[in-house]
């Protein structure tokens, strides 16, 4: 099984290192901050071979030039990001395969937060590196498309096994929990997770990874097809989940 190290970057970005103990290959999922990634590499003793970019936003790619210069890592980025990602060696599209040593992942194009966003899905290991598409108890802002586009991207996750570990690009768990409780106040599983989030944050940690099963039970954006979430945005049970999602996302923007 792979080894994974998560750590804080900038103020609320989450850095991730994915290490294959069989081959000693190691990938960083985005590089929000060069110093934080380099410190994590020093602490683990891992040698960085790859950088897998989820999307072009500055807070996910700022550290790439320095880290590549220090490590020689190969940079793989979404083709649709164009030249917005620095130092790119290879580009990927829907269905392409990425390898980190013996670990084999598939590229999903998951637009909605931005048009070039991708998720890296490692089926054998049940790992999804979701960037800013799916968060613990939340989802990314819709920035470049109608909300239905992000809903379609999120819907792909619903087909994955419940035990899938989801690694996201930011730690917004407390604000996400507050909104989730407002939207789904009678959800006992959500109440328990919100309490856990408070405890974890007090300890200086974060709820990453989450699992798909936990998110299906507690994340209002993945639960847009549930009657309780339709009612929370003054829609009838059975309403189009994409429309419910759009209303939830707009509410969260103002929350």
From Swiss-Prot:
Claim: Methyltransferase is one of the keywords in the record: no
Keyword terms, alphabetized: Hydrolase, Metal-binding, Zinc
Residues reported in the UniProt entry to bind Zn(2+) 2: 59-60, 132, 170
GO molecular function, one term: metal ion binding
Residues reported to bind Zn(2+) 1: 55, 57, 113, 132
Cofactor requirements of the protein: Zn(2+)
Matching Pfam families: HAGH_C (PF16123), Lactamase_B (PF00753)
E.C. number: 3.1.2.6
Catalytic reaction equation(s): an S-(2-hydroxyacyl)glutathione + H2O = a 2-hydroxy carboxylate + glutathione + H(+)
GO biological process: methylglyoxal catabolic process to D-lactate via S-lactoyl-glutathione
Cofactor: binding details: Binds 2 Zn(2+) ions per subunit.
InterPro entries: Clx_II_MBL, Glyoxalase_II_hydrolase, HAGH_C, Hydroxyacylglutathione_Hdrlase, Metallo-B-lactamas, RibonucZ/Hydroxyglut_hydro
Pathway(s) per entry: Secondary metabolite metabolism; methylglyoxal degradation; (R)-lactate from methylglyoxal: step 2/2
Coiled-coil region list: none
Binding partners and assembly: Monomer.
PANTHER family: HYDROXYACYLGLUTATHIONE HYDROLASE, HYDROXYACYLGLUTATHIONE HYDROLASE GLOB
Family statement: Belongs to the metallo-beta-lactamase superfamily. Glyoxalase II family.
HAMAP family registered for this protein in UniProt: Glyoxalase_2 (MF_01374)
Functional summary from the UniProt entry: Thiolesterase that catalyzes the hydrolysis of S-D-lactoyl-glutathione to form glutathione and D-lactic acid.
UniProt protein name: Hydroxyacylglutathione hydrolase
Organism: Methylobacterium nodulans (strain LMG 21967 / CNCM I-2342 / ORS 2060)
Lineage: Bacteria, Pseudomonadati, Pseudomonadota, Alphaproteobacteria, Hyphomicrobiales
């Amino acid at each position: 099984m792979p080894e994974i190290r998560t750590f804080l970057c900038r103020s609320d970005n989450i850095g991730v290192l994915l290490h294959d103990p069989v081959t000693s290959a190691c990938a960083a999922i985005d590089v929000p901050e060069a110093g934080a990634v380099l410190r994590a590499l020093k602490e683990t003793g891992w040698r960085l071979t790859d950088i897998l970019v989820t999307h072009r936003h500055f807070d996910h790619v700022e550290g790439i030039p320095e880290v590549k210069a220090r490590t020689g890592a190969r940079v793989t980025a979404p083709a649709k990001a164009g030249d917005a990602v620095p130092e790119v060696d290879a580009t990927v599209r829907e269905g392409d395969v990425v390898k980190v040593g013996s670990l084999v992942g598939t590229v999903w194009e998951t637009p909605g937060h931005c048009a070039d966003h991708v998720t890296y899905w490692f089926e054998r290991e049940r790992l999804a590196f979701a960037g800013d598409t799916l968060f613990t108890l939340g989802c990314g802002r819709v920035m470049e498309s109608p909300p239905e586009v992000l809903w379609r991207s999120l819907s792909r996750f619903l087909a994955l096994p419940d035990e899938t570990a989801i690694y996201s690009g930011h730690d917004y768990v407390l604000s996400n929990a507050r909104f989730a409780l407002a939207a789904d106040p009678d959800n006992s599983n959500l109440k328990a997770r919100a309490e856990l989030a408070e405890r974890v944050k007090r300890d200086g940690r974060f709820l990453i990874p989450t699992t798909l099963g936990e998110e299906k039970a507690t994340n209002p954006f993945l639960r847009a097809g549930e009657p309780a979430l339709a009612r929370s945005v003054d829609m009838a049970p059975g309403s189009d989940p994409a429309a419910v999602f759009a209303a939830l996302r707009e509410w969260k923007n103002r929350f």
